[in-house]
Amino acid sequence: MSTPDAQPDPEVYEQGRGMDAHNEVMREIRGRRDRTYDPREPTRVWLDEDNTPDGVYQSLTIILNTGGCRWARAGGCTMCGYVAESVEGGSVSHEDLMTQIDVCLEHEAENADEESGLIKIYTSGSFLDEREVPAETRRAIAETFADRDRMVVESLPDFVDRGKVRDFTAHGLACDVAVGLETATDRVRHDCVNKYFDFTDFEAACDEVRAVAEADDADAGVKAYLLLKPAFLSESEAVEDMVSSVRRCAAVDGCHTVSMNPTNVQRHTMVEDLFHDGGYRPPWLWSVCDVLERTADADAIVVSDPVGSGSERGAHNCGDCDEFVQTAVKDFDLRQDPSVFEEVSCECETTWAAVMEREKSYGMPLTR
């Protein structure tokens, strides 16, 4: 684990990207973590339902506990706390990673009536980064789930190439590469999220995946992950950035799904420090509805999964309507029908409208 004075590994992209100040703060914050983690236990595993180009599937979502995101070793993203839950030491063995997969399969067997058709695998960084997940492990995981229908694997665009995608499609699996783009606006991604790559890098990753689909007649595509209301944006700025970003992603060949997710306040992050100091409020659930409703005609599946919704640290409204609004969001995810939002209303929508009109980034948040 790095200390506040530790110098970042020069191979993790910090130098020359103008992000030294953010990274210095992030390294200090991450140095406060006070727990260790078992390399044989996944960070998270759960069952859900997801909309895909082939319809709605029961899904098994796995967050593998790896040695941590390469970018996070330099400082990393302002909102991401997963690296603080990573195993110390920088790597997890193939054997331990496969034990984590076994734990997830046991969870599925105990809690589901049938096997999930969709498997979603994430790490605290990039599943396709071979320093996090060795090629041997990636191929073994592909073989383990070869009898399922579809797999989603998350990666930064740097690590996306045709050979890695083919490790999955060669088994007849539909493969989606999920890219944490966060926003289509480079300045917001750099200055608010502290993420180093550009939109053109996302487009290049889409090209790699699309090339496999076209050359091999395979089912392969890209799922863009966007972030609603990163640090330093007002509510209205965040909403407008998301509407624009959803449309730009949907216009990229090969990107068939856009998952627009509101920021939640995770431990050991810059966002958490701002939150405790009164300088950050997670987005309103009304903002989630607004973005989904305004982009329902985009040429892609557009979904949202507000983690921690209804809590102080997650997207929330007044508290009275949160559960009903979250249900409408989930209904939209599965049906892609914006009329579901006409069925929910609350007096707090007036407060949200005032925040949208009056909140400025230098004086936020107007409400908690």
Label every PLM stretch briefly.
Residues 1-31, 250-252, 257-259, 263-368:
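Auxiliary Fe-S-binding modules of radical SAM enzymes
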Residues 40-99:
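Canonical Radical SAM [4Fe-4S] cluster-binding loop centered on the CxxxCxxC motif
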Residues 81-100, 104-133, 144-160, 174-202, ...:
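Core AdoMet radical
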Residues 91-107, 133-141, 197-204, 238-246, ...:
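Well-ordered, non-membrane alpha-helical segments in soluble/globular domains
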Residues 105-113, 141-146, 164-174, 207-219, ...:
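Acidic (Asp/Glu)-rich catalytic clusters
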Residues 125-127, 157-159, 183-185, 228-232, ...:
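Active-site-proximal loop/turn and secondary-structure-junction residues that shape catalytic pockets
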Residues 131-139, 161-170, 236:
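Distinct, well-ordered alpha-helical segments
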Residues 200-269, 286-306:
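Conserved C-terminal portion of the radical SAM core fold
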